[in-house]
């Protein structure tokens, strides 16, 4: 094997969506760093008899994938669900390689996605307040003299992201600190600076109404006062709002973004690790109750249970 050990390994989580999986992989293959990168594919087992053939079709496809330095496939005999599949899969790979890039089977990636992710993971590795690197971003307004290719937020994105072992390993997946959070209004207000939907999703997770790795990931980020890095030009768009989606069924205009189609391969990163009020305000507005209410009554409303 002649793969490049300085590049972060890529974990791809798939289930039963052949077309979406193919689109994700093909966009990843168009990245110049793909040939030097390791790809680890985790295929979850079918939930029921109806899904079995679709799972098998995806598995037949992933065994034909080429274009990477090394490909390893892990097929589960049982249905773990996305949360357990992702947590266990990432833990397996990140424990060995100490950093990871994570994809699900519903994304379209820019051709410079791997350049951006690897450069950001290297640049911010020793800046311990940075919790994760996001590849997705929605359209934000920046000062005219803004010269960086990234910004910082209180909320991570689950659509193409990366992190490091020392941030991942201590995460409280069991939400042991929730009891001290539940009735503390000030903590709710602070958590919801990343979006007024966060506390509600966390409560639903604790009650067992959703099974989400992402809300637990974001809650741990809040508890530790971490920040997320995201690009000023999105390196990812989501292609997963279909009837076959496990967690997202309806597309939302709030998540429309423009994919970076430039040939840029080196990026300018922020040295000063602090949150900016104008970014926080835009995130809060984007994920606000009013914004979600507009979606609910629009033709493009969506439902998330991730």
Regions found by a protein language model. Give the residues of each.
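An acidic/histidine-cluster motif and surrounding catalytic segment
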Residues: 1-102, 107-306
């Amino acid at each position: 094997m002649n793969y490049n050990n300085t590049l972060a390994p890529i974990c791809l989580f798939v289930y039963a969506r052949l077309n979406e999986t193919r689109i994700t992989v093909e966009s990843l293959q168009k990245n110049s760093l793909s040939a030097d990168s390791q790809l680890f594919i985790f295929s979850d087992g079918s939930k029921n008899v109806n899904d079995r053939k679709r799972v098998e079709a995806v598995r037949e496809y992933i065994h034909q994938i080429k274009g990477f330095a090394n490909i390893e496939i892990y097929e589960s005999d049982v249905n773990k669900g996305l949360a357990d599949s992702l947590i266990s899969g990432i833990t397996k790979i990140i424990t060995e390689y100490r950093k990871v890039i994570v994809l699900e089977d519903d994304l379209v990636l820019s051709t410079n996605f791997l350049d951006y992710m690897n450069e950001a993971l290297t640049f911010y590795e020793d800046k311990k307040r940075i919790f994760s690197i996001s590849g997705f971003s929605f359209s934000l307004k920046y000062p005219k003299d803004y010269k960086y290719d990234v910004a910082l937020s209180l909320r991570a994105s689950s659509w193409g992201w990366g992190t490091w072992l020392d941030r991942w390993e201590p995460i409280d997946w069991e939400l042991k600190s929730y009891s001290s959070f539940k009735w503390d209004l000030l903590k709710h207000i602070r958590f919801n600076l990343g979006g007024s939907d966060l506390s509600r999703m966390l409560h639903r997770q604790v009650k067992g109404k959703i099974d989400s790795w992402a809300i637990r990931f974001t809650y741990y980020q809040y508890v530790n006062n971490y920040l997320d890095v995201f690009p000023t030009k999105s390196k990812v768009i989501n292609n997963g709002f279909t009837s076959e989606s496990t967690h997202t069924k309806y597309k939302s205009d709030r998540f429309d973004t423009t994919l970076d189609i430039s040939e840029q391969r080196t990026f300018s990163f922020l040295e000063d690790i602090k949150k900016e009020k104008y970014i926080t305000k835009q995130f809060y507005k984007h994920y606000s109750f009013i914004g979600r209410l507009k979606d609910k009554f629009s033709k493009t409303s969506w439902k998330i249970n991730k």
